[in-house]
Amino acid sequence: MDMPVNEVRELRWDEYDSHQHLKNASKQAHDRKYNEFLIVDVDAHHYENEHYGEVFQYIESPVIRRNALEGIKRGGRSSMMNSEVGYQDTGGRMTRHWLRKHEKVPADKHRDVGITNKWMDAMGVDYSCLFPTPMLFLGTHPQVEVEVQLVNAYNRWLVERILAHEPRIISMLYLHFNDPEAAYKTVKEFAGKKGVKGFMITSPRYKPVHDNAYMKTYRLIEETGMPLSFHAAYSWNEQSLQLQNRFIGVHALGFMWFNMVHMTNWIVNGLPERFPKLKVMWIESGLTWAYSLMQRLDHSYLMRTSDCPALKRKPSEYMREMYYSSQPMEMPEDKSILEATFKMIKADTQLVWSSDYPHWDFDLPSVIYDLPFLKEEAKRNILGGTAAKLFNLDTTPVKKIPAVG
């Protein structure tokens, strides 16, 4: 295997240990006494493609199941999956992306449970909300029935093979939004299952969130008391983003753009008034987009209230009642800018920390804990207290931070 050049230290390609990889994170965890309070990661990932042999066994359609299983026999990615151009490992420099196959985990645990537990402890995380990685792009799959079959299989596999065996790992299950009836059935089937703490819509897709076909699903989720989240991603196939010639541009814009589109439709079509008790969360878009969109929508609304007859308040007031994951959190040199953003979104009660680990731009809990303008109570709310209320979690810390030599 060709190795990235490194003149500073020797790189090994035959071993990998999350505790060693994240030893500085563990040092932070000890120094900041994370063991004294709850930390919940509302957005982390695994690479479900490494277990397609298991996942695809859950596909209900015999034709699609056979095609999917035959596709992975020949190596490479599955022939059933759509994919996106991307450079997540930055030319191999993100070594955890390709060395994780050497991670040693306890034999009595599913591999993904073992790997997830190791990095959680290293960071000082008590609970982690786990999402897929390649399947985040299924919303633009050209075959709706394939998305439905693959997502149904993944959800059942996740619930039965992962969530049922590790109480520290939770998830908000993928809703196949391109088929409204299938999305509704997913909520009916999985609400109340062990580890299922809500439901998630992948944001890169071209279905309007205000379509009446989804209203019964929103109502059902509202009745469960669980949150509905929109998980951002990018798509280089989006026509406007095809003008970008570098991954950095597509990534920076795409992760904001799709959630901005869905948020705008959610607000101007009066869904907060229609479902006032539905807890809505926006994941992995950072924070600045929300601050900006609040101002833009308020400015237009005050001149065109007739366009939004269902609204009784300014758009920003509804947005302040929603929840936002922190990562990838912008870090301006002038911290007063970040402080203003926190104030605008009511971060003390509406912001929830997320790592996005193991992706290339992940954040540690210290991005929140070390902010000078936050009081201790606000830090603890953002790092775990608010998420514990959202997900109905025990607030007793259960992490086991490894010792650092």
Give the positions of each predicted feature.
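Mid-to-C-terminal alpha-helical segments outside catalytic/metal-binding sites
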Residues: D2-L38, N49, G53-Y127, R156-A164, ...
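Catalytic pocket-lining loop regions of alpha/beta-barrel enzymes
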Residues: M3-V5, Q149, L163-I170, L175, ...
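Divalent metal-dependent hydrolysis catalytic cores, especially in the metallo-beta-lactamase
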Residues: I39, L99-P106, N117-H141, R168-L175, ...
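Active-site flanking residues adjacent to catalytic metal/cofactor-binding acidic residues
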Residues: V40-V42, F230, I283, S355
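Metal-dependent nucleic-acid phosphoesterase active-site entry motif
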Residues: D43-Y47
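Aromatic-lined carbohydrate-binding/catalytic grooves of carbohydrate-active enzymes
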Residues: G139-E145, A191-K194
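Active-site entrance/lid segments in N-terminal catalytic domains of soluble metabolic enzymes
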Residues: P142, N152-A164, L173
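Short glycine-enriched, charge-decorated loop/helix-capping segments at active-site entrances
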Residues: Q143-E147, I368-D370
